[in-house]
Regions:
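C-terminal helical subdomain
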Residues: 177, 193-240, 244
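Canonical Rossmann dinucleotide-binding motif of NAD(H)/NADP(H)-dependent dehydrogenases/reductases
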Residues: 1-29
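Conserved hydrophobic beta-strands of the Rossmann-like cofactor-binding core
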Residues: 3-6, 75-79
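Conserved glycine-rich Rossmann-like NAD(P)H-binding loop of the short-chain dehydrogenase/reductase
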Residues: 24-40
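Rossmann-fold cofactor-recognition segment
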Residues: 45-60
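Conserved Rossmann-fold cofactor-binding substructure of NAD(P)-dependent oxidoreductases
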Residues: 57-73
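Catalytic loop of short-chain dehydrogenase/reductase
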Residues: 83-84, 88-89, 97-98, 120-172, ...
Length: 256
């Protein structure tokens, strides 16, 4: 039995992932953005070992979440599932940071940097990472005309870079990125082609399986298969630069 933290577990892929893990006998700690959603996830995943609460659109709450989550650990695996989709207009958080970048990139970085190291880290990305571009001087899309889909795609490429950077930084930890597919969730929309259980399958497999194919690090997966990510994700200088920008924006450096 493994102990697993799943962020963003109140609906969609995160909730399905938590249910699948609990259903196969694993100890699961679930995460909700606020107390109201915590009530919902307790109903949805009644056998969860614990619920931790924190809004990933707040650096202060994300730091507190790392502490609260560690109290419920240690973990064999952490699945960084929580995320937000493209927005119609550029939104900023209480920290003055762009919402999509903060929730999708800075929050998993901060949790990774602050929490005790698990044996495995899984970062959910999207097939749209293939369309992403990294502009280190404008990661938060403050310049030019706002494009929510572009901001989302770029954030998902950042998630792949983050997974690969962590894999290199911590060779003793298995860190991988997962494209769950176009899943029928609130974010995926009614036109999505893939059923919800399929979206949870590969994150669960990477988090707990002893299959040799799952015991790797620094890889990009879809449907339990290693695929090639956006070529930019393999740029080690870009990986280091992203870690440095995340450290600057959060005030926390990824420890050795």
């Amino acid at each position: 039995m493994s102990s697993v933290l799943v962020t963003g577990s109140t609906d969609g892929i995160g909730r399905e992932t938590a249910r699948a893990l609990v259903g196969t006998g694993h100890r699961v700690v679930v995460h909700a953005r606020d107390e109201r959603r915590a009530v919902d996830v307790r109903v949805a995943v009644p056998r969860a070992a614990a619920i931790v609460v924190g809004d990933l659109a707040s650096l202060e709450e994300t730091r507190a979440l790392a502490v609260a989550a560690d109290r419920e650990g240690p973990y064999d695996s952490v699945i960084n599932n929580a995320g937000v989709g493209g927005t119609a207009c550029r939104e900023t958080t209480v920290d003055g940071l762009e919402l999509i970048f903060q929730v999708n990139v800075l929050a998993p970085y901060l949790l990774t940097a602050l929490m005790a190291q698990p044996a495995r880290l899984v970062y959910l990305t999207s097939g749209l990472e293939a369309q992403g571009r990294i502009g280190l001087d404008d990661l938060q899309h403050a310049r030019g005309r706002w494009d929510g889909e572009r901001a989302y795609s770029d954030s998902k490429l950042c998630d792949v870079l983050l997974a690969f950077a962590v894999a290199r930084h911590w060779p003793e930890v298995r860190a991988n990125a997962v494209d769950p597919g176009w899943i029928r969730t609130r974010m995926g929309g009614p036109g999505a082609t893939d059923p919800l259980p399929l979206g949870a399958e590969t994150p669960v497999w990477l988090a707990v399986s002893d299959d040799p194919e799952a015991l790797v690090s620094g890889s990009y997966f879809k449907r339990r298969r290693q695929l090639r990510a956006n070529p930019a994700a393999y740029d080690e200088d870009l990986q280091r630069a992203l870690l440095a920008r995340c450290a600057d924006l959060t005030g926390v450096t990824l420890p050795r």
